[in-house]
């Protein structure tokens, strides 16, 4: 077969993927979702079913008051259409601090309620306060989640090794945000890259910096070599890639998943692996 270095590519033979993740289901999501849609980007919005519709004002010394009221249950399905809804715990409790029965209740009731509102199974979760332990991960898996996001910035574009320790690249207020965006779009190398930004919609009001996310989305949107996907779509794609089955000499690859996959086997050779099909791989040079 010649020399090979099989490397994952994203749909359409793209080498880059961009996703975002925003928490708490605050009313600022209405403006944020519109910005996402206007720029053709996608993300995951992590909601607390138990507080949807709750009215609240955040007050902190030396800071302006910020409306942190939550969106209404009735608008969830239409507001987040085209994006992804994820779980964030029923009441945004520190799940790792709770007894296991109550932690499971928070996870299950949140997921069940949000699934009724969206009409589809939830795949993604964001840890409240970024806090988790082995018990929380085990309960999330039992509830049917496929992955969960932390709040630990990596400043890198590496693909996740553990879907339940999904570390983002950075928060939108990170001083290196636009530098990272530039590195992501224009950096050299052939390995797949994931740029993953997170935050809370209310922070744009509190910091009076909506121009920050507008600048990022204007810069990131509209690139043909970038796959714009939700958190769940990316993890599902990576999971399907892990399921590939090789013949012993590498001349055939079977894709048992329901997802078309894309692969680079050398600098000159790329393959599309159709869902549920076995593909004969083209020869590569020695």
Identify the residue ranges that each predicted region occupies.
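C-terminal domain-boundary segment and adjacent tail
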Residues: 2-10, 38-40, 115, 147-156, ...
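A Trp-anchored, charged/polar loop motif used as the substrate-binding/catalytic surface
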Residues: 26, 171-186
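Short, well-ordered alpha-helical microsegments
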Residues: 27-31, 133-136, 262
């Amino acid at each position: 077969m010649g020399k090979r270095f099989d490397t994952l590519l994203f749909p359409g033979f793209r080498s880059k993927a961009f996703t975002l993740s925003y928490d708490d289901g605050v009313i600022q999501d209405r403006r944020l979702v519109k910005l996402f849609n206007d720029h053709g980007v996608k993300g995951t919005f992590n909601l607390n079913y138990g507080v949807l519709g709750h009215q609240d004002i955040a007050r902190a010394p030396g800071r302006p008051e910020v409306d942190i009221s939550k969106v209404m249950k009735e608008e969830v399905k239409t507001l987040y259409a085209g994006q992804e809804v994820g779980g964030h715990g029923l009441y945004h409790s520190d799940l790792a601090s709770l007894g296991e029965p109550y932690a499971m209740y928070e996870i299950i009731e949140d997921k069940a309620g949000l699934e009724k509102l969206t009409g589809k199974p939830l795949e993604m979760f964001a840890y409240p306060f970024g806090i988790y332990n082995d018990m929380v991960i085990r309960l999330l898996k039992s509830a049917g989640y496929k992955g969960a996001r932390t709040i630990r910035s990596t400043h890198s574009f590496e693909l996740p090794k553990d879907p339940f320790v999904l570390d983002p690249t950075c928060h939108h207020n990170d001083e290196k945000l636009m530098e990272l965006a530039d590195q992501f779009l224009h950096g050299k190398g052939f390995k797949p890259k994931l740029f993953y930004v997170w935050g809370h919609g209310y922070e744009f009001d509190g910091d009076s910096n909506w121009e920050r996310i507008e600048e990022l989305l204007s810069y990131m949107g509209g690139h043909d070599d970038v796959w714009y996907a939700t958190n769940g779509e990316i993890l599902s794609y990576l999971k399907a890639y892990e399921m590939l089955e090789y013949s012993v000499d590498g001349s055939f690859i079977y894709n048992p998943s329901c997802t078309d996959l894309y692969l680079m086997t050398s600098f000159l050779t790329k393959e599309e692996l159709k869902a549920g099909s076995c593909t004969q791989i083209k020869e590569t040079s020695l």
